[in-house]
């Protein structure tokens, strides 16, 4: 059996894996155990009551967190004309069409989010093998294919998170940084869970949000008692 590191022993002693914690207690635990030499992200895993093998039960979308994610987000926008000027005014770092596509083909990937106006998808479509595996391909469901690219840029800059269930029916995303206040992390988590509940597939049966766990970049997961969250039913 692998020897536990000092950090892992501390986590094991502090976190009861069988318990669901009050959100305030859960965040306090994360903060106490976040001893990395950098400001760790606070991530969330939400187990959904869906059958991910069925396409009509998959959950995908985006929502803006009230307190953002704590990350500086670089945005690339595929568009032209007046939309290009609007995207630049909204704060997009990279704006273009074919010339932007050529940069990406050459390996220049200095951005975190890709947004496209519908007329630009003919160009973006050719980048599927590059953007797709990185989770960067624009999609109408996440608001990244839209005629209003300026609003999409503002949302991305304001702390929009995109979510999509994995093959096990679990949503993984981030809700901030460990140096956020407890209230900020709580409100961000509540906003995410409310968005997920609104995105519940009509064919999904039974309990939809089955389990919520939060963790830091280098830490263990702490289960959250959903009764301590204020979310839409």
Swiss-Prot record:
GO terms for molecular function: rRNA binding; structural constituent of ribosome; tRNA binding. One of its GO terms (biological process) is translation. Keywords: Repressor, Ribonucleoprotein, Ribosomal protein, RNA-binding, rRNA-binding, Translation regulation, tRNA-binding. GO terms for cellular component: cytosolic large ribosomal subunit. Gene3D superfamilies: 3.30.190.20, 3.40.50.790. InterPro entries: Ribosom_uL1_bac-type, Ribosomal_uL1, Ribosomal_uL1-like, Ribosomal_uL1/biogenesis, Ribosomal_uL1_3-a/b-sand, Ribosomal_uL1_CS. HAMAP family: Ribosomal_uL1_B. Binds directly to 23S rRNA. The L1 stalk is quite mobile in the ribosome, and is involved in E site tRNA release. Part of the 50S ribosomal subunit. This is Large ribosomal subunit protein uL1. The gene is rplA.
């Amino acid at each position: 059996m692998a020897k536990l590191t000092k950090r892992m022993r501390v986590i094991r002693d502090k976190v009861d894996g069988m318990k669901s914690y009050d959100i305030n207690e859960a965040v306090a635990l994360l903060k106490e155990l976040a001893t990395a030499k950098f400001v760790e992200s606070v991530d969330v895993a939400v187990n959904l009551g869906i059958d991910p093998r069925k396409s009509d039960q998959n959950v995908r979308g985006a929502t803006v967190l009230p307190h953002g994610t704590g990350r500086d987000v670089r945005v690339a926008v595929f568009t032209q004309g007046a939309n290009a000027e609007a995207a630049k005014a909204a704060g997009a770092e990279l704006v273009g069409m074919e010339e932007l596509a050529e940069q990406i083909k050459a390996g220049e990937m200095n951005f975190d989010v890709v947004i496209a106006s519908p007329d630009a998808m003919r160009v973006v479509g050719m980048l599927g093998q590059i953007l797709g595996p990185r989770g960067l391909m624009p999609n109408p469901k996440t608001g990244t294919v839209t005629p209003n690219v300026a609003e999409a840029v503002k949302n991305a800059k304001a702390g929009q998170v995109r979510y999509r269930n994995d093959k096990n029916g679990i949503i993984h995303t981030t809700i901030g940084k460990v140096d956020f206040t407890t209230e900020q992390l709580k409100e961000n988590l509540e906003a995410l869970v409310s968005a997920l509940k609104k995105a519940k597939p009509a064919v999904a049966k039974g309990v939809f949000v089955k389990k919520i766990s939060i963790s830091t970049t280098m830490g263990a997961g702490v289960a959250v008692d959903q009764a301590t969250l204020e979310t839409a039913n």
